[in-house]
Amino acid sequence: MKSKWMSGLLLVAVGFSFTQVMVHAGETANTEGKTFHIAARNQT
C-alpha cells in the first residue's frame, strides 16, 4: 500500500516538473534548448 502511494506521488511530482519545464520553455522560446538542458541536468 505504501509503495503504491509513493509511486503515485513520484509520478505526480515528475509530471508536475515536466509541465513546469514545458511551460517555461514555451514562454522563453529563444532559450528553449538551453532551458531544457539545464532542467535535464538538474534532474540527475
From Swiss-Prot:
Proregion positions: 1-39
Regulation: Inhibition of RapA requires a free carboxylate group at the C-terminal end of the PhrA pentapeptide. A free C-terminal carboxylic acid PhrA pentapeptide inhibits RapA phosphatase activity at a 1:1 ratio and is approximately 200 fold more active than a C-terminal amide peptide.
Identification of the protein by name: Phosphatase RapA inhibitor
Family in the record: Belongs to the Phr family.
Organism: Bacillus subtilis (strain 168)
One of the GO biological process terms: sporulation resulting in formation of a cellular spore
One annotated Gene Ontology cellular component of this protein: cytoplasm
Keywords: Cytoplasm, Secreted, Sporulation
Subunit structure: Interacts with RapA and inhibits its interaction with Spo0F.
Function: Signaling molecule involved in the regulation of sporulation. Secreted during production, but the mature peptide acts intracellularly, indicating that it needs to be imported into the cell to function. Inhibitor of the RapA phosphatase activity. Does not act on RapB.
